Amino acid sequence: MANSVLTATYEGYIRDTADALRIFEACLTGSLTHTARRPHDRERSTLITSGNVFVYEEGSSGIKRWTDGVNWSPSRILGNFLVYREMNQPFSPGEKKRASKKPKKQAGVAKAYDHRPQATRFSSMPNDPAGVCAGGDGGAGDEDRDLVGSLTDSYDFKPNSLIKKTISITHNGIPHHLVSYYTVDDVRSGRLVRPSDHEFFGRVQPRMELMSGQNFRVPLEDGGDEESRGVMSHGQQVMPYPCNDYQIFQHAYGNAAAPRTGQFTYGPPQNGTYAPVSVPATHAIQNGTYAPVSVPATPALQNGTYLPVPAPQNGSYYNLHQNVHQNVHQNPAYPWYHAQLQ
């Protein structure tokens, strides 16, 4: 075990809780492998790099604390994750890990307001009971808060510094941990592929325990991240209410969407492209692509399942969020929806 070759569990970018849950589920089912040990000193230069994701469970690995030899800043909260950013120098022994004070802005110079929506609303949350350091204020690099949280200019960071992002879950009473590494440039350039953007994970559906049996800081339905909660950027509710975490995940990442391709290095899917589960009889794969879906003209809510969506026009894929919202919003047969708007 100690001399075994260590490889990453996955190579890509874990953007949100839904991405992480897909990775955890794939590890639990054996599609991906858990990390059996921490990297040795001689392995760190090749393993602790942008894009590598490691998942380990405390029971069999015996890992109580993940170490990688990088000089990290104090942690910051980012939704259900903790993020760290690589620094030029470590803190001296006994030195307090205080964020540096930013210079005051000169009066009379107004900074243009950035109207772009931030990818997360939780990048500057205060300390949590576990002792996570409070976030800093804005400053240079505010446009990257979706990637670094509040770690924008509060410490002496390396140029294009490595970022560590972690999240933990419990399965059958055993903690499982995910540790991912990336740089802002690699994410922005699209070099790192999210699990939800890879066809391999189109058939990976997290089990109920992973969705609703966790003590997440931000529950999925309360805004753990935008995609997992099934709410579009302009705030429209697009699914029946009420619903649970599992329904939210199915709606946001369910099998209705055709799988997409991307970089994946550990076991590509077998037998070609996977068809969605529970596909209507008229749905077929032609030449490796999905044919338009024929669905009933009048959507209906039955046994808590999701509303069917109208067939696509002009041969394009249907817009799951937009069409469901329009059907429900315009159809008086759904009083529960209109009651939510009052």
UniProtKB/Swiss-Prot annotation:
- What is the top-level taxon of the source organism? Eukaryota
User: Looking at the UniProt record for this protein, which Gene Ontology cellular component terms does it annotate, in alphabetical order?
Assistant: nucleus
Q: Which family does it belong to?
A: Belongs to the MIT1/WOR1 family.
InterPro entries recorded? Gti1/Pac2 (IPR018608)
What name is this protein filed under? Global transcription regulator FGP1
Q: What does this protein do?
A: Global transcriptional regulator of pathogenicity. Regulates many genes during growth in putrescine medium and during infection. Involved in the developmental processes of conidium formation and sexual reproduction and modulates a morphological change that accompanies mycotoxin production.
What is the gene called?
FGP1
What is the deletion mutant like? Results in greatly reduced pathogenicity and loss of trichothecene toxin accumulation in infected wheat plants. Exhibits normal vegetative growth but shows defects in asexual and sexual spore development.
User: Per its record, what are the GO molecular function terms?
Assistant: DNA binding
Keyword Protease part of the UniProt annotation? no
Where is this protein chiefly located? nucleus
* Disordered: annotated segments: 91-113
* Keywords assigned: Nucleus, Transcription, Transcription regulation, Virulence
- What would be one Pfam family of this protein? Gti1_Pac2
- Where located? Nucleus
